């Protein structure tokens, strides 16, 4: 069981596998729960995980087969019950397990009469067959039968334009999707303000990996997808600071505040609260954390005081002086200061 603290909650977020079974060599099933989640979180997590499981998990497939002296994929080969197209479809169904990257070569070379199964494929050391009994072809006569194969690790559907290859090499529309199906359901429980949700997640795989392994890989892919956003604010701050360092404004912030004080003489500045200035939520929160609640509090601060506020940025400074000059003429404040 993995536990993770939930921000703003006294409970811990927990997940566990409540059911796991092997229905066949090519069908694994797993059922997981995640709880407690706040209202709406279960649907968010369920949708994201389902998409990641079905579309982002890598699988290994046979992507190409080469026959000798075969004019097209609809040809028949003497001494073989299946046509070339049927053999290609059987090769497409072979389930492989590996951690290889790039293209690898494999082959089949047998002598009939006999049945050819996945067990007859000669594979590189890093690849193994999940179900060795999967059928490929039936040799009805004592002939030599050889196929050169290409194996590749990828994700999703891989299709190629079909055309006759003079060298007898034919692409196979590979389906690199080890997760066969994903379902999720949500159960709500609790009363009043204590309501929370439980996410149930069901995963079926083709045997090349377990549902638990698939869930781990999908979660890791989602984390990698969101990692750049964790550094976006830091990178943006660095960019703004560098830009303003070399191109300072024509008038300093402190000079503008001094001019505002002179122009607004007689105005009860302690009666104007910063939430009346239409500041952005980010700038407003920075000022509130620094106990700046009124316009008088703000105008009493120097530029250096403001820049020492936690998370306060150069763009916040510019936004403040632009907002003050825009929204603080005498005639615009009469209604607000009439009390």
UniProtKB/Swiss-Prot annotation:
Q: Which GO terms describe its biological process?
A: DNA-templated transcription
Matches recorded under SUPFAM superfamilies: C-terminal domain of RNA polymerase alpha subunit, Insert subdomain of RNA polymerase alpha subunit, RBP11-like subunits of RNA polymerase
Q: Which key words are in the record?
A: Chloroplast, DNA-directed RNA polymerase, Nucleotidyltransferase, Plastid, Transcription, Transferase
**Region of interest (Alpha N-terminal domain (alpha-NTD)), ranges:** 1-233
Q: Name one Pfam family in it.
A: RNA_pol_A_CTD
**A GO CC term attached to the entry:** mitochondrion
Instruction: Spell out the molecular function terms from Gene Ontology.
Output: DNA binding; DNA-directed RNA polymerase activity; protein dimerization activity
Top-level division of the source organism's lineage: Eukaryota
Q: Which Gene3D superfamilies match?
A: 5' to 3' exonuclease, C-terminal subdomain, DNA-directed RNA polymerase, insert domain, RNA polymerase, RBP11-like subunit
Q: Does the keyword Nucleotidyltransferase apply?
A: yes
Catalytic activity field: RNA(n) + a ribonucleoside 5'-triphosphate = RNA(n+1) + diphosphate
- This entry's Enzyme Commission designation comes to 2.7.7.6
What are the start and end residues of every segment in region (Alpha C-terminal domain (alpha-CTD))? Answer: 264-339
Localization recorded for this chain is: Plastid, Chloroplast
InterPro entries reported in the protein's UniProt record: DNA-dir_RNA_pol_insert, DNA-dir_RNA_pol_RpoA/D/Rpb3, DNA-dir_RpoA, RBP11-like, RNAP_asu_C, RNApol_insert_sf
Primary site of residence:
plastid
Subunit structure comment from the entry: In plastids the minimal PEP RNA polymerase catalytic core is composed of four subunits: alpha, beta, beta', and beta''. When a (nuclear-encoded) sigma factor is associated with the core the holoenzyme is formed, which can initiate transcription.
Q: What does this protein do?
A: DNA-dependent RNA polymerase catalyzes the transcription of DNA into RNA using the four ribonucleoside triphosphates as substrates.
Give the family this protein belongs to, as stated in its UniProt record: Belongs to the RNA polymerase alpha chain family.
The Swiss-Prot or TrEMBL note on domains reads: The N-terminal domain is essential for RNAP assembly and basal transcription, whereas the C-terminal domain is involved in interaction with transcriptional regulators and with upstream promoter elements.
- From the Swiss-Prot or TrEMBL record, give the protein name: DNA-directed RNA polymerase subunit alpha
Naturally occurring in which organism (per UniProt): Psathyrostachys fragilis
- Gene symbol of the encoding locus: rpoA
């Amino acid at each position: 069981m993995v536990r993770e603290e939930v921000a703003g909650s006294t409970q811990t977020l927990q997940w566990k596998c409540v059911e796991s079974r092997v229905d066949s060599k090519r069908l694994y099933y797993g059922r997981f729960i995640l709880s407690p989640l706040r209202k709406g979180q279960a649907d968010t997590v369920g949708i994201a995980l389902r998409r990641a499981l079905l579309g982002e998990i890598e699988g290994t497939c046979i992507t190409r087969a080469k026959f000798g002296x075969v004019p097209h994929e609809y040809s028949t080969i003497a001494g073989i019950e299946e046509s070339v197209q049927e053999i290609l479809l059987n090769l497409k169904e072979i389930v492989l397990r590996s951690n290889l990257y790039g293209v690898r070569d494999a082959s089949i070379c047998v002598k009939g009469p006999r049945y050819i199964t996945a067990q007859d494929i000669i594979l590189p050391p890093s690849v193994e067959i999940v179900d060795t009994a999967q059928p490929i072809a039936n040799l009805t006569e004592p002939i030599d039968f050889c196929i050169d194969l290409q194996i590749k690790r990828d994700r999703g559907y891989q299709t190629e334009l079909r055309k006759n290859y003079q060298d007898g090499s034919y692409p196979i529309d590979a389906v690199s999707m080890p997760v066969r199906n994903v379902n999720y359901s949500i159960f709500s429980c609790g009363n009043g303000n204590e309501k929370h949700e439980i996410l149930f997640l069901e995963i079926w795989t083709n045997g090349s990996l377990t549902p638990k392994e698939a869930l781990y890989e999908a979660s890791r892919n989602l984390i990698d997808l969101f990692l750049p956003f964790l550094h976006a604010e830091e990178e943006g701050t660095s960019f703004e600071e560098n830009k303003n360092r070399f191109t300072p404004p024509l008038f300093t912030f402190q000079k503008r505040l001094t001019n505002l004080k002179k122009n607004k003489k007689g105005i009860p500045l302690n009666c104007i609260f910063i939430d009346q200035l239409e500041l952005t939520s980010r700038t407003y929160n920075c000022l509130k954390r620094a106990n700046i609640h009124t316009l008088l509090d703000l105008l009493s601060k120097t530029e250096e005081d403001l820049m020492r506020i936690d998370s306060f940025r150069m763009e916040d400074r510019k936004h403040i002086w632009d907002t003050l000059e825009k929204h603080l003429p005498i005639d615009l404040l009469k209604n607000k200061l009439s009390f």
